[in-house]
Amino acid sequence: EEFLHHLEASLPVASDEEYTSAKKPLNIVDLGCGNAYLTFATYSFLKNTKSMDTNVVGVDVKRQSKEHNEAVAKELGWERDVSFVQGTIEQAEIPGSENVDVCIALHACDTATDQSLVRAVRWKTKLILASPCCHHDLHVRIKKSVTSSSSSSSSVLLAPMTSIARHGILYERTIDNVTDAWRALVLRILGYKVDVVEFIGGEHTARNTLIRARYTGAKATKELWDEHDAMVSSFGCESYLTEALKKELESRRISVT
């Protein structure tokens, strides 16, 4: 329910006559949909509550999830508007991917969140709602940098990180936040307006961060690039997302005057 409130508040097209008059359906992709609880809830909310013509595609790597979800959609009479694709987030072929309006990724583990962001960016998605889960990849990358730099003073930031890295729970929480801050920064450079918010109470799950990004096409500023370059130099590594979107990022850097 809380997620749907954020979706409603975030929709760049919620009051757009182009959609509400049914001249054009709102196209949504749910990456890593699992048993599609969110997929069906999103469709029902937009179609039945908001009266918006909506198409939703759920993507999951498991064939059994696809078959189960298709059966549920048929039972509900929604099979025309709600469909499912089996495949990885990186490689699944999405029908109508050139017209994706909203991309959802709820609790995609580790780099699956990054892979979802990559696909959303390359689809030029208008709205991205991603709730990250575990953050192992950057933990490993930064820990390697901390270890290799422990006897060096080359980085102002890595010195205190050595102390934090001694305590697993402190290191985990710190790098979780660094990971999501870096993701938000990359999206800003690529022309998105980004908010990072809590979308459900912490008593339900500790994984309650929502990255909410709306595409505006805003130009990447020198200040944003300075922040990005400081992240790389301070932590001594790239993130998964900066490597995956290297081409897109560099094209934005060239445009900075």
Locations of the language-model features?
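Class I S-adenosyl-L-methionine
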Residues: 2-9, 25-27, 53-55, 59-257
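Glycine-rich helix-loop-beta junction characteristic of Rossmann-like nucleotide cofactor-binding loops
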Residues: 6-22
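Conserved class I S-adenosyl-L-methionine
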Residues: 24-34
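Conserved SAM-binding loop of SAM-dependent methyltransferases across substrates and taxa
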Residues: 35-51
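Short loop/turn segments at strand-loop or loop-helix junctions that form parts
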Residues: 31, 40, 131-133
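Inter-helical turn/loop segments and adjacent helix faces that build the functional surface
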Residues: 13-14, 49-53
